[in-house]
Amino acid sequence: SGNIFFHDAGEITHELLHTGVGEGILSTYCGFKKEGKIMPYKFQTLVWVEEATGDVYCEWIPLCEEGLEVKKVFWPGPMEFEEKKGSWYTLLTHQQGILIPNTWEVEFQTPVFDGMFGTAGAYMPWFAQVRDGEGYLAVCVTPWNSGYQAEHPAGGPYTRVSMRFEPSLGKMDYRRIVKYTFLKECDHNTICKTYRNYVEEQGRLRTLAEKAIRNPSIDRLIGCAFLHKGIKTFVQPDSDFYDPEKPEKNNHLTTFAQREQEIRQLHEMGVEKLYLHLDGWAEPGYDNRHPDYGPACKEAGGWEGMKSLVDTMHKYGYLFGIHDQYRDYYLSAPSFDENFACRLPDGTIPRHKRWAGGPQSYLCATQAPYYVKRNFKALEDHGIRLDCAYLDVFTCNEGDECDNPLHRMTRKECYEHRARCFQYLLKKGILPSSEEVNDWAVTSQVFCHYAPYDFMMRAPGTPKQGIPVPLYNLVYHDCVIQPWMMEKISEEEDYMLYALLNGGAPYLVRDGAYPNTDGAFEDRVEMTLEECITRAKVVSDLHEKVGKCQMVRHEFVEGNPQVQKTVFSNGISVQVDFQKQTYEIRNENYFSE
């Protein structure tokens, strides 16, 4: 254990490298000592400039891993970025996006999942810094076992951000690449559009318009109000969520017939377009016994009651989808077999009992597509016609790795298996959703549970760690539908404004599965259902117009972060004033080139 620096190498050589596409410096590091003995460990770095673009590539290349067990490689290091000026700022893709001026008064805390790419800590594998209109974009070309770390003390005067690489199945194993693009006269819009161009070059940009050619029901989802409800909650006594002091809080049940009546009521109240996301619909209850989740909850009405609810939804032209889960692997599942749980290189199998279902490990994602096919066939066999399906945590939590020889899996392969689950649903005409959004999922994910700003996941009133900016939407607004929290937290903070600014879909009602978790806080202004419907209609009407449009620009009006404006590719703009708690929607007839 401990830190080893590049300059600790006993032998370091450099050579100039010229190729047909650029030139750079190849450096070789070897002769590292451990307990006084020279180890065979050896690696190279290649830093080169691409002639056609001027982009700078930094490559870390393992040659021999014998002798040292490397846990993390911190390279390239952070840029020098110290001056207490608001025009010097850092862009992080922590959830929807955050802009940290060097003058920001709040310290930046460690992001969720420690800033690992492919998680909620980094929806996209890049960061950027801009100083007085000049900046750089750092893209991790090999993001699967990589992340970032950032440091900004309260009040500045600096922000440091850099890449790190981590092992895959216990070894560094493969070449790691970071690409730097340097820009003049740039801002966060330029940065995001530069990254979008990169994604398009890779063939990974897939718009909703393109997806709707294969699955036309996408057009029906655009403009819907989102309704998040549940059927059965059962908290196992050995779950961390179990409350022995108040056992009546642990379990509750709502019948399918009751939910059906609520749908009828919403229709009578004038709700025209609606999507119902249904939790806890199966016999075990929410977050229990996955992946063996059926049958439909008998106490709530069974398959017959569930089918009646679905048929009523379809009678009104509404869309229906279920919550499902193919990562959490519960020991209570009848088919549970430790041989198919994710196994670490040291032979251990991670376990916890955080959620309602109690003790669990993680299902190796190589198995997930098979369980998806099995379970969705059972739903189809019972006449449940699904429009959508939510596969929990796939786009929020890190990819898993598994070292079981029967189904060895890298993190990169894990993301590919998760995408296979989405693709299977698309083939069946079912629109796939997951918890949040992520760069790796854009080609196959249609919508999400939410894609919030990071501050929305902390208790109301917690100081913001930077200025919330829609970095993800500046890249991918026209690719993935995102419903937004609509809570009015106080007279000074209304999440509806963020929903409008982002051109997203509204939550009509969002019943969180766990109290004070995942942004579902009780501290908010109470509203009647009529008020919620009225507010959701405003957001739905806007989403109907801009849901398939690119967000072409985001700005601070007259440089004021409290007054923000977005412009979409069809000319519609949204301006919100967070101080006055007002919004304005206009058609500026602005078209992107």
Give the location of each predicted region.
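Acidic/polar residues at beta-strand termini and the immediately following turn/coil
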Residues: 1, 48-50, 392, 404, ...
